[in-house]
Every structure is written in C-alpha cells, then in structure tokens.
Amino acid sequence: MNPKSNPDTIFSAPIDKIGDFTFDERVAEVFPDMIQRSVPGYSNIISAIGMLAERFVKPHSNVYDLGCSLGAATLSMRRHIKQEGCQIIAVDNSKAMVERCKLHVNAYRSDTPVNVIEADIRNIDIENASVVVLNFTLQFLSPEDRYVLLEKIYAGLRPGGILILSEKYVFEDQVSNELLIDLHHDFKRANGYSELEISQKRSAIENVMRPDSKKQHKERFAQIGFSSYDVWFQCFNFGSMFAIK
C-alpha cells in the first residue's frame, strides 16, 4: 500500500555548493525510497500510527496529519479508522508533495474522507481533534515555533485525544549521541548510500533540521498540560512519542 518511487540519487554526485535541503519536486519523486533507506524503523512507525489511530479516534472527530508528505501516515490511519463521521485533514507546505499525496489518497477507496491541503501547518486551525500526527515534521520548525504549535494542538484536541510525535533525537550524553549517530550512518551505508551521499545530505539538512532531546519533548508536554506522554518506539536516534490530553 506504500507509494513506489524512483531510487534516491540526489546526493550521489559531487555538488559544488550544497544548499539547504528542501522538499521540492526532486525529493518528492524519490521520497519513499529516501525515507525507507534513511529513517530506521520508518515502516514500523507508519504501521503503528494506524493502530494508535484506531484505538484513539472518536466518532465525528477530526484527524490531522501535519506535514503529511506523500500521505503514508494518512493512508495507514484511514485503513484503521472504523468510526463514523471522521475526516482526515492532511497538510503539507510542499506543492510537489501535496500533488502526489492527492494521487496516492485517491488511488484507494475508503469511507473516511481525506482533505489534502497545501499550507503552512503553523496556520492550520486544529478543531475537534481526536488524533494529531506530527511524523518527522516538528524538527523542521524553528525552536520558538514548536511550543506554539504544540499548544495549539493541545487546545484543539478533545479530552482523551492523542498526539503522535515522531522525531530524530539528540542525546545529552556525548558518547551516547556520537554512538547513535554512527549507528545511523551504518544503517544508511547498509542501505546502499555512499560516504559522499551521507556527507552531502548531512550538510544540506543540518541548517534546516534541528532536533531536540527526549527530555526537551517531555518538558514541553508537561508545560502544555498533557496528562500522559512517553516514548513508544525508538531505533538508534529516531523515535516516536505519544502525548495524551
């Protein structure tokens, strides 16, 4: 059920001047291959997002996929949602991603409607939500915008609603942090990426993706008022957390 893509060769040749990473047409074309080969445990996270949605979704409520890219989490949730009167609102600010996401969503029939929107997730109203997903999205916002968005999500969640937040993590202990970075690079090598590709991708993304520690995430959840929160999945320095209102 996952969308197919061309192989990711974006960083395979030397680039004289490496610009900041953007989710443009080139990335959208190879995104499924890129993320499977770059994010350890990605398929497990996508599958479990559907299971969590099935458990937490309420009838006549909204489900949000903020930073939906090609719609993998949206499709996983839609397959699991059995409640009446629900809709999924999938949002991304990349025109190329949104266009492809609509094609993927429309390729499968479902009783749960999906509204795919091209917009900045910071400007989206969160209302009557039982499930909100931020799947490797928050880390691309400026640090000052993260708290504001999470506050908005909390306000728009129904009591008992869940936020699913997948992120890359930094670790406060330097030895642990370096080991997990090295293991992630080993993972990418095992998936066919060259040293040049790993190095150039890192240079392109380091200015636009600034990950937090698990402690920082938990402190934000507590300050905002979530009643329960924890890590439910981790592989190397990538993982996913839940926060329940």
Curated annotation (Swiss-Prot):
It catalyses: prephenate + S-adenosyl-L-methionine = carboxy-S-adenosyl-L-methionine + 3-phenylpyruvate + H2O. The keyword Transferase applies. GO terms for biological process: tRNA wobble uridine modification. InterPro entries: CmoA (IPR005271), Methyltransf_25 (IPR041698), SAM-dependent_MTases_sf (IPR029063). Gene3D superfamilies: Vaccinia Virus protein VP39. GO terms for molecular function: carboxyl- or carbamoyltransferase activity; S-adenosyl-L-methionine binding. It is an enzyme of class 2 (transferase). Its EC number is 2.1.3.-. S-adenosyl-L-methionine binds at Y42, G67, C68, S69, D92, N93, D120, I121, N135, R202. It holds the Pfam family Methyltransf_25. Keywords: S-adenosyl-L-methionine, Transferase. Catalyzes the conversion of S-adenosyl-L-methionine (SAM) to carboxy-S-adenosyl-L-methionine (Cx-SAM). Belongs to the class I-like SAM-binding methyltransferase superfamily. Cx-SAM synthase family. Homodimer. This is Carboxy-S-adenosyl-L-methionine synthase. The gene is cmoA.
